């Protein structure tokens, strides 16, 4: 860990494992995934099955990994509304902590505090599966660097480890040794992301959707998936003072051993995850041609994602397990309408 609580890069493979590479550079290797089916049963006697992922690295291009390397798989987060999330006042996020601190049911979220290179200080994290980036600018520049190896003013070093000499010798895209994406271009990308609209709700007057909304509140899902906020300051005038319904508290919660990755990140421990916004979740199959959810995509649909909840959310999960199928279907219809 560094001084900000960030895990240190693996010596040979860095912070992020990459299975592909440009011409003339060796790929880091391959990742093999297999799943174990975990059967379960609802109170009404109907059955379900969850899939537990197992990962194996093969064809390593730069030698074995260091023993004890912490690995945490990720799927890409959803993009709609990120500019609005960026504009939620920090005071509102901290208020969520205070409101939950007085609860007696074990739901006690906390913020992650991370170093924001754009602010030059530690601030409340709000993006990433463990709330490990602080702003949309931070998230964007970090993704350019970590996901596709593009340097910027705040992330100027090439993402090559000492063993990756072919990576270090590859051509650079920046002019005169400067960053590969300049500030003006990065700002345009940030503006594009910030103004991605949230899709309109569907079927909100449907009787099952409305009943599902009541069940959502009854199961205490809305404690962590806080429905609404009013946005505050933003570089983009159209995003200021907006009533929004992202359904998140942006806090870290212990989700139990079933979802644990064992990898700390800032103040987040190996069992804690940020509550993801739910808006647009029902359109993921239309946009991405799949319905994989949670940090590593193990859940194949909304109901499976709910059934993976543990830890602070286990009481909510138990309520869903007790629901008859008609109620479970209504709950899922509501979530997918957001």
Language-model region placement:
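Periplasmic c-type cytochrome electron-transfer domains
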Residues: 1-338
């Amino acid at each position: 860990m560094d001084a900000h609580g960030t895990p240190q890069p693996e010596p040979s493979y860095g912070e992020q494992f990459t299975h592909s590479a440009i011409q003339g550079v060796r790929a880091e290797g391959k990742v093999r995934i297999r799943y174990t089916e975990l059967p379960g049963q609802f109170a009404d006697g109907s059955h379900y099955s969850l899939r537990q992922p197992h990962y194996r690295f093969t064809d390593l291009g730069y030698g074995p990994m260091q023993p004890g390397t912490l690995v945490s798989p990720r799927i890409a987060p959803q993009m709609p509304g990120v500019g609005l999330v960026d504009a939620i006042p920090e005071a509102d996020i901290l208020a969520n902590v205070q409101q939950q601190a007085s609860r007696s049911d074990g739901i006690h979220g906390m913020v992650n505090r991370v170093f924001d290179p754009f602010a030059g200080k530690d601030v409340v994290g709000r993006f990433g599966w463990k709330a490990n980036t602080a702003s949309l600018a931070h998230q964007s520049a970090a993704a350019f660097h970590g996901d596709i190896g593009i340097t910027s003013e705040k992330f100027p070093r090439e993402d090559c480890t000492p063993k990756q000499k072919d990576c270090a010798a590859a051509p650079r895209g920046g002019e005169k040794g400067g960053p590969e994406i300049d500030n003006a271009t990065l700002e345009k990308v940030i503006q594009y992301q910030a103004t991605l609209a949230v899709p309109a709700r569907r079927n909100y007057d449907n009787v099952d959707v409305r009943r599902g909304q009541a069940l959502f509140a009854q199961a205490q899902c809305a404690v962590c998936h806080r429905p609404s906020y009013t946005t505050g300051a933003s570089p983009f005038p159209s995003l200021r003072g907006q009533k929004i319904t992202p359904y998140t508290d942006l806090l870290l919660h212990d989700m139990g051993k079933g979802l644990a990755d064992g990898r700390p990140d800032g103040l987040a421990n190996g069992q804690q995850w940020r509550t993801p916004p739910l808006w647009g979740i029902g359109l993921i199959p239309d946009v991405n041609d799949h319905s994989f959810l949670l940090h590593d995509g193990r859940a194949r649909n909304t109901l499976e994602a709910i059934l993976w909840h543990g830890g602070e959310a286990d009481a909510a999960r138990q309520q869903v397990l007790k629901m008859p199928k008609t109620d479970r279907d209504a709950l899922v219809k509501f979530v997918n309408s957001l």
